[in-house]
């Protein structure tokens, strides 16, 4: 039984989502005192449609930010979302990672019980 379960887990798809570029760079935005960068989220998971965007420091503590359209994104299967991330100039040295995390629908029957988290490191 254990061998069968291990075989099923090993043969399953390891598809997640993708966040590019891998190393985004913060540049001055059109808003004074604010830095911005552009990332693209690609959804490779058929069972997931929603992703949460976050910005963290080197210790994975949250950093204040704003993303275009809010921090929860709906991305269809094999679709892309272009996201502009804005960070205060005073927080640019703290901001280390831009991360996206797949969100499972609450109360719905899910094929997947696994949430994926992908981060890009800010240069």
Predicted regions, residues:
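Sec-dependent signal peptide recognition
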Residues: 1-7
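Sec/Tat signal peptide C-region and signal peptidase I cleavage site
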Residues: 5, 12-18
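N-terminal edge beta-strand
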Residues: 17-32, 67
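Short, solvent-exposed loop/turn segments enriched in Ser/Thr/Gly
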Residues: 31-38, 93-97
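Non-cytosolic beta-sheet module surface loops
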Residues: 41-45, 87-89
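Short acidic, flexible loop segments centered on an aromatic residue
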Residues: 44-62, 101-102
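Intrinsically disordered, low-complexity Pro/Gly/Ser/Thr-rich segments with frequent PxxP/GP/PP motifs
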Residues: 56, 62-92
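Terminal connector regions
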Residues: 89-123
């Amino acid at each position: 039984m254990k061998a069968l379960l291990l075989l099923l887990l090993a043969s399953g798809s390891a598809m997640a989502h993708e966040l590019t570029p891998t190393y985004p760079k913060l540049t001055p935005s059109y808003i004074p005192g604010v830095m911005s960068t552009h990332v693209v989220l690609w959804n490779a998971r058929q069972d997931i449609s929603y992703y949460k965007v976050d910005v963290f420091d080197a210790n994975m503590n949250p950093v204040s930010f704003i993303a275009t359209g809010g921090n929860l994104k709906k991305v269809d299967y094999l679709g892309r979302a272009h996201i502009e991330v804005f960070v205060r100039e005073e927080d640019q040295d703290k901001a280390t990672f831009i991360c996206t995390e797949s969100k499972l629908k609450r109360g719905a029957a899910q094929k997947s019980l696994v949430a994926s988290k992908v981060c890009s490191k800010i240069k």
